[in-house]
């Protein structure tokens, strides 16, 4: 699975399960700046229209070991700095033990592999 396919899978899951409750799902949404001053692009933004509550989701998928591992600490710090609630959603068998430890210990990360 490619990273954008995982993002779309998570977006579809949120839409199917929460769309009937008034949640609208957007992908690739521009939202302010990152902690290093770059323009931020969220993978997924879930918005409940009735009260304008929002949730940012960053989707990370890694099937084989690679450079995505190196991006996780930054992604978690960037989510902490967001002015709306956010979560890093991850899956795949390619995470190193150290990064898995970081993800599993973070209150901002959740393993999610919808079928």
Model-derived regions, located:
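Acidic-basic catalytic patches of nuclease active cores, encompassing PD-(D/E)XK
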Residues: 1-33
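Active-site metal-binding core of divalent-cation-utilizing nuclease and nuclease-like domains
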Residues: 21-51, 66
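Hydrophobic beta-strand scaffold residues
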Residues: 25, 86, 109-111
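Residue-level "edge-of-site" marker
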Residues: 31, 92, 115
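Catalytic cores of nucleic-acid endonucleases
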Residues: 50-55, 60-106
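Charged, structured surface patches that assemble and position nucleic-acid processing machinery
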Residues: 104-115
């Amino acid at each position: 699975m490619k990273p954008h396919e995982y993002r779309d899978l998570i977006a579809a899951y949120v839409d199917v399960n929460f769309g009937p409750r008034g949640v609208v799902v957007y992908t690739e949404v521009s939202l302010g700046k990152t902690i290093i001053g770059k323009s931020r692009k969220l993978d997924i933004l879930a918005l409940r229209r009735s009260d304008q509550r929002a949730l940012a989701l960053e989707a990370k998928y890694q099937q084989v070991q690679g450079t995505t591992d190196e991006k996780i600490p930054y992604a978690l710090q960037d989510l902490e700095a967001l002015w709306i609630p956010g979560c890093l959603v991850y899956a795949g068998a390619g995470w190193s033990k150290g990064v898995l430890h970081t993800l599993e210990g973070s209150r901002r990360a959740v393993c999610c592999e919808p079928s």
